[in-house]
From Swiss-Prot:
Redox regulated molecular chaperone. Protects both thermally unfolding and oxidatively damaged proteins from irreversible aggregation. Plays an important role in the bacterial defense system toward oxidative stress. One of its GO terms (molecular function) is protein folding chaperone. The gene is hslO. Pfam families: HSP33 (PF01430). Under oxidizing conditions two disulfide bonds are formed involving the reactive cysteines. Under reducing conditions zinc is bound to the reactive cysteines and the protein is inactive. This is 33 kDa chaperonin. HAMAP family: HslO. The lineage of its organism: Bacteria, Bacillati, Cyanobacteriota, Cyanophyceae, Synechococcales.
Amino acid sequence: MKDRIVRATAANGGIRLVAVLTTESSLEAKKRHGLSYLATCILGRAFSASLLLASSMKIMHGRVTLRVRSDGPLKGLLVDAGRDGKVRGYVGNPDLELDLVKIASNKYSFDFKNALGTGYLNVIRDSGIGEPFTSTVELVNGNIAEDLASYLYHSEQTPSAVFIGEKIENKGVICSGGLLAQVLPKKDTDPLLVSLLEERCKEINSFSEDLFQSKDNLLSLIRNIFPDIDDKSISEKARSQEVSFKCKCSKKRSLNAMKMLDKSELEDILKKDGEAELVCEFCKNKYLINYEEIKSIIEN
């Protein structure tokens, strides 16, 4: 099934719910960047986190940029996601693999904490109107979900719960996604709603397992956690909004990037190579700028 996002409310409109599936987007990123399993999981989690944040934006062309700057061997990451469901991103060290860490009897997990190390999560919300809103928080433990929850608590001061996970088998990632539950701003002083949110979240023992068992049915996933979901809040449009790995790069953007170079630099490229190849960091697409195109930039 294609990746998608579903929005709903519970408790008579007091709690906002968003669930996202990012399996195919994560696999596409793995293929394009040659990611290890560990890097695939971390980038997939960042995809889910950024899409969950972007889902609350009022304007369809609104975007969220999520950047991690840290001292871990992953060497950080950058993700760009839109309210339209388009997401792209990359990590600093795509080949990184670390030993699994034991989290319980016969249960192991990827070492997200050591992969990212200590550092900061930077979130930029850009609605396309006025200046983008930027906020930075320290990384909590590198599993992305708790890092995002920390951002929501400190920057938006909204009672929130964030769950992000994935299921891995020998053949690779078989599911990846996330869930965001928030008490809506006008209701955030209601102790009963905050208590309800806490109670529902305590019932989640393993979000990754719940995601897998839902078999890509996000409505089923939400209902299992919030049985008091408001069915009227789920529109057909919300049910069917697709999510996909999609980059904004193009030959035109590459030519514009070349125009930023000094005339002497362009002349040096013509003299040494006769052409230039630009590679997009987000998707690894390659764009060849030939001799005539570079010459035209110099002359104009």
